[in-house]
Structure formats: C-alpha cells, structure tokens
C-alpha cells in the first residue's frame, strides 16, 4: 500500500494519505505535507518534538496535527520525516512525537512553502482494508 499521493487542486496541493491504522494514516498525511516542503528521504530523525492535542472530531484532530507540525516549521525551521503517535478516539486526543531536523539548504531541497492546513475537501474514511485521509494544504 502506498503511504500518500498528491492530487491536482487549483493553486493549492491536495494530499491523499493511507494507513492500516488511523495513526499510520495521520503519520502518512504529515509525511505528505513535508514532502511538499522538501525531500523527506534526506531528513534525518535526529530531534523530536512532543505533541499533545485534543479535538472535537477526527477531522479537527487532523487539522490541529498538521497545523502544529507547520508551526514547528515556521518557528524553528523543523522538517519531519518520522512520526510516532497514539490517537484515542473516545477522548479525541492525539499524543506523540515528530522526528526530524532543522532545515538546512545545503542538505535539504527547498520545494514549496506550505502556508496552512485547510478544511477544504477534508475527509477521513475507513475502508475495508485501511484509512484514507484526503485534504488540501494552502501554498
């Protein structure tokens, strides 16, 4: 199973992420976002940021997850390539770690700046075999 793919969207970037679990799908969604920013295969998981979030539904939790990661990119130039998280659907909480390093133009390719997560076309579906997350980021 592929981890994520991009789809065409006028002036923005659409991402479809997949995972056998909700956690894997959220991780792959984040990986897709950072693949827009840089080549994540060159991002070494040498530092981490702990993340604790709560939301009112899964879509809101995903929105907050991506926004939190983008906050670290905006404020510290952190780019991420590895994620370890747990989602509790009863309390609608997410806790985990995002692993990566500070962006370095000598090592990391500068692609496109992701300005923000959006609710446009945001959906989280559970199919027979996996979770499918669809969303659009503002560039």
Swiss-Prot record:
Role summary: Activates the tRNA-splicing ligase complex by facilitating the enzymatic turnover of catalytic subunit RtcB. Acts by promoting the guanylylation of RtcB, a key intermediate step in tRNA ligation. Can also alter the NTP specificity of RtcB such that ATP, dGTP or ITP is used efficiently.
HAMAP family the record matches: Archease_arch
Keywords in alphabetical order: Calcium, Metal-binding, tRNA processing
Family per record: Belongs to the archease family.
Pfam families attached to this UniProt entry: Archease (PF01951)
UniProt source species: Saccharolobus islandicus (strain L.S.2.15 / Lassen #1) (Sulfolobus islandicus)
Domain of life: Archaea
An example Gene Ontology molecular-function term: calcium ion binding
One biological process term in Gene Ontology: tRNA splicing, via endonucleolytic cleavage and ligation
InterPro entries: Archease (IPR002804), Archease_arc (IPR022952), Archease_dom (IPR023572), Archease_dom_sf (IPR036820)
Protein name as annotated: Protein archease
Positions of Ca(2+) binding: 12, 138-139
């Amino acid at each position: 199973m592929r981890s994520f793919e991009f789809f065409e969207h006028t002036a923005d970037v659409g991402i479809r992420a997949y995972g056998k679990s909700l956690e894997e799908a959220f991780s792959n969604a984040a990986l897709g976002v950072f693949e827009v920013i840089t080549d994540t295969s060159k991002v070494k998981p040498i530092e981490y940021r702990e993340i604790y979030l709560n939301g009112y539904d899964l879509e809101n939790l995903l929105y907050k997850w991506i926004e939190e990661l983008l906050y670290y990119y905006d404020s510290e130039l952190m780019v991420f390539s590895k994620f370890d998280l747990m989602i509790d659907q009863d309390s609608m909480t997410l806790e985990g770690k995002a692993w990566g390093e500070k962006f370095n133009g000598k090592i990391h390719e500068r692609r496109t700046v992701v300005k923000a997560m959006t609710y446009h076309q945001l959906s989280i579906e559970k199919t027979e075999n996996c979770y499918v997350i669809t969303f659009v980021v503002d560039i």
